[in-house]
Each structure stands twice: as C-alpha cells, then as structure tokens.
C-alpha cells in the first residue's frame, strides 16, 4: 500500500530495486521498509521485467512506470478501431487485464474525460420526438390497417389478409390480399373508400419507405395526399388498434378452412361488427350508423344443421369474444385485485408481535433483558437476574422482584423476559421475598425430573413446600398465594398420584430448612 503523498512510480522502483538486489533503495524510509517487504511478495521478475502476480500469484500483469508507456497502453485499450472508443469501465478492464501501475484507475478516468472524440459523441444526444396522441371524436376519422399472413393459399390465390379498424367505433373490415405490395394494399384501401369514403388518417405499423409508396399509389388512383402515416409517429395509442379477438379468431378460421378462408371474410367482418364491445356496451354497427341491424335469423348457440353459415359464424365469434372477456378482467377488477394482493403481502410481511412467547406467569423465575449491542452482524443481548414475577399489569408488562425481595421500579415487557433455568451444579437454596416463600427449582429429591422442565409444573411442585406450615404465611397476600398454589396442587395430585411420595420426601427436607430459619 502506497502511503499518502508518495509517488506511485517511486514506490514501484523501490520494490523493483528490493526484488533485484535484496536491499532497500536509498530513498526508502525506515518506516516504509516493512511495507516494501510485504508488497514485494506480490511481484516477480520474468525476463528482466517486473510483473505483478497478486496475493494468489495467478495474475501476470506487466508493471508500467514511464509516462510514455502509460499513454501507449491507454491509447491501445481505449481505441478499438477507427471511430470506436470504449468507456471508462471497459477501458479499465482491458488495462488491468495485462498491465499494472498504482494510479491506473485515475489515469483511465482522466484519459477518457480528455478524449475529444468521446466528448463530441457524448454531447450528441438524440431526443425522441414528443408523442401527441390524436383525439378521435368522430366515426371513420382515424383508421388503422394491420396485415396478417401468410396463410394457406386459397382457391382464389389469396395468401394475406388486411384488417381495417375504425378507432372510434371499432368497425372492422377484413379484405384478402394476394401479396403485400404497395399496389395491392392501395387497391384494397380504395375499395373501402368507395364504400365509406376516405378517412382523415390511416395508421400503419410499417417502415416509412413502404408507407411513402402506398401514399404515391393512393394519390395516383384516388387523389389522396399523405393520408397514410406511421404508427411510430405516436399519433395513436397501440392498445386502441385492432382488437386481439379479431386477430386470434381470424388465424383460427384460416387454419380450419385453408381453401375457402377468403370467401367468408365479409361474413366474419359483419359478425364482429354486430357483436357488442365491452367499453360502450354497443355494437360497432350501432356506433357507426346509430341503429342496430335487422337480422332475419337469430343465431343459435348450438349451431345446428338448420342454421345458416352466417349464423354459425356469428355464434362462433360471440363465443370467442366471451372467452376473451372471461380471461381478461376489467380495469376496476384488476386494480382492486392488485390492491388486495398488495395489502395481503404487506400483512404477511409484518412480523407478529411476541407478547408472551414463553407463557410466563406470576411466580416464575426469569431473566430480564438489560442491554442490546451490535456484534457479528446482529444484535446481542445482555440478560441479568434471576428475578421473580410479582404481578402482571393490564398492559401485559411484568413487575419483578430481585433476589433480595426489592421490587423493581419499572415494569418490564414480557417479550424482554425469558425463563431462568438453574444448572444442576447449583446448590439447593431457599430465599425469602417480603413475606412470601419462593422455593428453588433445583430438586434433589426428584432425580427423574430433567433440567429445563416446563415452568408451570415446577411452580406447582414448588408450591407444595408452602403447605408445610401455614402459620408462617401471616399476610393476606401470602394467604391468597397459598390458596392459589394449593388449588394447583390438588389437580396435580388427582391426576398424578405417583408424585405423592416424592412430594412428601421434599416436604421433610423443607421442614428442616424452615425450622433452621426460625
């Protein structure tokens, strides 16, 4: 490591001198010698040239000292052919893969920042044109044209299909095409002009050169100037173009009827136009002519043999449109479901509060958490005690007494407590807590009870010691505590009669302790 203010080239010269002669360079300070020795382990001489191999000794980077060599390396790694320059990250990667000097990172940054070619290229920013979506307010004012295919060649030599969709009414016209040349598409568009008149704009998702050819043909055949524009101009929202139901059903129909798919395109168009659409709840036919068509035959869903071809087509179109509606929820449903999922995820991520994870009760011996500090990537806790739970407040906090019987000033949260389990090596003790006797948890007379037994059982068995002499419990509070413990003992004795002998053996030892204390 190079000390602050020291020349990096001088540092490398000192390392090279030490590796070559085994002695320190005359300019090396006494405080720098240990650093030179450590750094020299990462360098080796190969063919009278110094190479940096690193700690793992797997690298092989030539040490560059002179300024001329540095500029040559930077020029070779930054310029990649005529007119192509790398950025800072790529240039630094190329330099560090083969060369080494102490200030390589800063030198690469300064070299790229000072490059005139990079500055000119960076200042030339192509700003995307601002999109101005046209507002469609009248029928047949803005029309989109989509091309589909190639399909199976029909009996009339048609291979492609052209779909014209009115953005305001969703009126659909499907026409067959033999090819997708500009002249063929222009002829099909003019046939629609003769039926409904020319719209204000026709939007196509094609390249500009192809659109210019179509405009030339339309002007030659119909006299319309620049009526077709590109969808890339941003004049229409792509989601408002041809409905996906039309494209999906047309692809399916052409696959099922490879020879005659072009003969039924007018029927398909009319079937889609008399089918109600979701946003307005009206059919495109009604939006276009402000009236509903007079259908001579009501199409049946079953599509039996008695129905016409057009009726079967209308039934299939309505069925396909219903499937798409069922699969695609409404915008309000999507927003509500999204909000519900977000709320559920937030609730799931929220960690539940552990109010009393150890099920602690009055009389339990516990350790309390006093201090937290950060260590080894997590918080460490300091536990002090033991203390005894005197009572539990309405808010769920515990009031504790220490081993001298002194009540602590502040209540402690139950989540900041944990049970205190005595070690088997500790002596059997009995301490007095301001008028109430609390026995120790270490049972000499009960060898079959393992250490760490559930605290409720330990407290019940400890409570039997309090029955030895009721006269010792003078205060009313102690009397209530004794009755509570006796009730617990009676239930235990009825269910576990086998513990009676152990309990009385413990009573004898406790009597001796009480007589000694008295």
Swiss-Prot record:
InterPro entries: Integrase_cat-core, Integrase_H2C2, Retrovirus_Pol_polyprotein, RNaseH-like_sf, RNaseH_sf. One of its GO terms (biological process) is DNA integration. Keywords: Phosphoprotein. One of its GO terms (molecular function) is nucleic acid binding. It holds the Pfam family Integrase_H2C2. This is Gypsy retrotransposon integrase-like protein 1. Residues 326-348 are annotated as: Disordered. Residues 135-293 form the Integrase catalytic domain. The keyword Phosphoprotein applies. The modification Phosphoserine is found at residue 498. It comes from Rattus norvegicus.
């Amino acid at each position: 490591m190079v000390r602050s203010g020291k020349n990096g080239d001088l540092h490398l010269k000192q390392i090279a001198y030490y590796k070559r002669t085994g002695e320190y360079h005359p300019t090396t300070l006494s405080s720098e010698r240990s650093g030179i020795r450590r750094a020299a382990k990462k360098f080796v001489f190969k063919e009278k040239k110094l190479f940096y191999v690193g700690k793992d000794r797997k690298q092989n980077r030539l040490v560059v000292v002179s300024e001329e060599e540095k500029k040559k390396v930077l020029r070779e790694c930054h310029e990649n052919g005529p007119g192509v320059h790398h950025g800072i990250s790529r240039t630094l990667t190329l330099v560090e893969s083969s060369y080494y000097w102490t200030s390589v990172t800063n030198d690469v940054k300064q070299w790229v920042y000072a490059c005139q070619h990079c500055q000119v290229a960076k200042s030339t920013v192509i700003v995307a044109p601002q999109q101005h979506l046209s507002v469609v307010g009248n029928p047949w004012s803005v029309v989109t044209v989509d091309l589909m295919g190639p399909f199976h060649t029909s009996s009339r030599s048609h291979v492609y299909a052209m779909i014209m969709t009115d953005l305001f009414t969703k009126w659909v016209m499907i026409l067959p095409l033999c090819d997708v040349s500009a002249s063929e598409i222009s002829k099909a568009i003019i046939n629609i002009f003769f039926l409904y008149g020319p719209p204000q704009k026709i939007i196509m998702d094609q390249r500009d050169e192809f659109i210019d050819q179509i405009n030339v043909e339309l002007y030659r055949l119909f006299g319309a100037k620049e009526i077709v524009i590109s969808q890339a101009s941003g004049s229409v929202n792509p989601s408002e173009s041809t409905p996906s139901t039309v494209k999906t059903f047309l692809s399916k129909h052409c696959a099922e009827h490879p020879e005659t798919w072009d003969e039924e395109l007018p029927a398909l168009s009319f079937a889609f136009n008399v089918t109600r659409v979701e946003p307005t709840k009206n059919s495109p036919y009604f939006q276009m002519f402000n009236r509903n068509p007079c259908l001579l035959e009501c199409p049946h869903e079953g599509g039996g043999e008695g129905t016409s071809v057009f009726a079967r087509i209308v039934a299939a179109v309505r069925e396909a449109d219903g499937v798409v509606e069922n699969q695609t929820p409404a915008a309000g449903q999507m927003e509500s479901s999204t909000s519900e999922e977000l709320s559920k995820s937030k609730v799931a991520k929220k960690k539940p509060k552990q109010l009393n994870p150890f099920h602690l009760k009055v009389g339990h011996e516990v350790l309390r958490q006093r201090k937290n500090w950060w260590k080894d990537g997590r918080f460490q806790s300091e536990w002090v005690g033991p203390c005894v739970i005197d009572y539990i407040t309405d808010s769920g906090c515990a009031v504790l007494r220490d081993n001298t019987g002194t009540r602590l000033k502040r209540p402690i949260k139950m989540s900041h407590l944990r049970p205190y389990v005595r070690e088997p090596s500790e002596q059997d003790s009995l301490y007095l807590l301001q008028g109430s006797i609390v026995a120790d948890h270490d049972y000499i007379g009960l060898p079959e009870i393992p250490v760490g037994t559930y605290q409720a059982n330990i407290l019940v068995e400890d409570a039997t010691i309090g029955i030895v002499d009721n006269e010792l419990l003078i205060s009313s509070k102690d009397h209530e505590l004794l009755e509570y413990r006796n009730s617990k003992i009676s239930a235990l004795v009825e269910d576990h009669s086998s513990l009676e002998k152990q309990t009385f053996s413990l009573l004898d030892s406790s009597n001796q302790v009480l007589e000694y204390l008295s």
